[in-house]
Amino acid sequence: MIFFLSFRIIFKIINTVGDKYYSSLFYISMFFQNVLFGKNIKVKYKNPSLWHQYGGAGHITIGNNVTFISYGDHSYNCRCKIMVEKDANLTIGNNTGFNGVLIYCQESITVGDNVNVGGGTRIFDTDHHPIDWQERRLNKRDKIKHAPIVIEDDVFIGAGCYIMKGVTIGEKSIVAAGSVVTKSIPKMEIWGGNPARFIKKL
């Protein structure tokens, strides 16, 4: 029993030291990539991967008390990744949490305050490739479709979701785990499925 308690204490100390180390690395990464960031940003288990195209030519703003968890119990064994293209705008509000989430921003993604995003979720404001096969073959990057995403305050997005280009998720709404969101969701509603559909009002 004593050994077990000692092991738990040691493990907790290691985790605490590790979290502070990875938080420091993330602060350094944000500083050198011209990210505007607030206070008390928390990183657990591994610092997020931050990829800012062309030496910080996009715009990233991260608010206060934002938490990034990578490789945690509910992270789908994923690391948090933030990828922002040239001239794109990513804004993350206060008191928001991400668990093994990938954000890819080519135009504009806005995440409000008090938002929770579950493990393995992907947020893409772009199709990544042209829809037309001939344009894909010729790698016509200018033909790729993209549109802004807005996730309003107090939204909860379950694990393993895909949030696709051009959608707005209204305040206090819930997206069920494993959903693919292809159209906008009004406030105070639960949606789920592939593609996500209305389930009930809150």
Regions found by a protein language model. Give the residues of each.
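Domain-scale signature associated with acetyltransferase and cell-envelope carbohydrate enzymes
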Residues: 1-124, 152-153, 171, 187, ...
